[in-house]
């Protein structure tokens, strides 16, 4: 069998490979606890980007082909897994960034729950008077609305990963239809990129520049944000959006 993982090049063109190390070459965990927080911020940010981008790619492909053969019934699970896990990574990147920038020593509990992570992040933003980075919490509106919808169905964090747990089944196992509006979900993620991710990317920039957040600097940073518009005549528009903004 041909090897999948390679340590060097071969005769194939470079675009025949995915380089796992490409975004992580300078981010090997150091021994210093403080340094680890900085590295964690970058790594969570990058990993979150990759999962969110994957959700967008799958959704865009399904919508462009009008959900041919109803493939969304299968693909909705990796779409949701990538969305929730990517968002989890973004939230953890935000928490790590703030604790690093302000040398905060509080230990937050390990969790996968979006609601708990959001609560921890809001607490940190209030503690250091930097709520403006997330538009005075308006950037959390999308996350809060998603969490509220999931709570209506008593959804577990692993609902898109496993269809059952212990002696129970997930909420969608049964006779009643549980439908997902694919277009609304796509727009939800796009908006999430232009709100929450934009704020997080400013925190990452602060770490990279070794400065603490500043409201005027943040306003200038936001003025340069992109604005993706779905244009069916421009085949590269979506790929450019993914490359530059996700």
List where the protein language model places each region.
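Domain-scale activation on soluble regions of proteins
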Residues: 1-246
């Amino acid at each position: 069998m041909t090897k999948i993982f390679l340590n060097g090049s071969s005769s194939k063109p470079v675009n025949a490979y995915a380089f796992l190390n490409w975004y992580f070459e300078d981010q090997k965990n150091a021994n210093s606890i403080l340094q680890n927080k900085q590295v964690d911020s970058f790594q969570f940010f990058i990993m979150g980007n990759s999962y969110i981008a994957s959700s967008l790619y799958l959704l865009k492909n399904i919508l462009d082909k009008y959900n041919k053969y109803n493939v969304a019934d299968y693909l909705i699970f990796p779409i949701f897994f990538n969305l929730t896990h990517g968002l989890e990574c973004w939230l953890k990147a935000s928490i790590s960034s703030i604790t690093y920038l302000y040398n905060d020593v509080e230990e937050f509990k390990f969790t996968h729950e979006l609601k708990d992570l959001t609560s921890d992040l809001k607490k940190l933003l209030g503690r250091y008077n930097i709520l403006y980075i997330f538009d005075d919490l308006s950037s959390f509106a999308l996350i809060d609305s998603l969490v509220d919808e999931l709570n209506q169905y008593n959804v577990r964090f692993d609902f898109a990963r496993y269809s059952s747990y212990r002696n129970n089944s997930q909420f969608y196992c049964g006779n009643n239809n549980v439908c997902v509006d694919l277009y609304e979900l796509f727009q939800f993620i796009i908006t999430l990129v232009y709100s929450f991710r934009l704020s997080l990317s400013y925190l990452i920039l602060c770490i990279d520049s070794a400065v603490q957040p500043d409201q005027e600097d943040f306003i200038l940073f936001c003025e340069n944000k992109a604005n993706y518009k779905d244009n069916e005549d421009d085949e590269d528009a979506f790929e450019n959006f993914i490359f530059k903004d996700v």
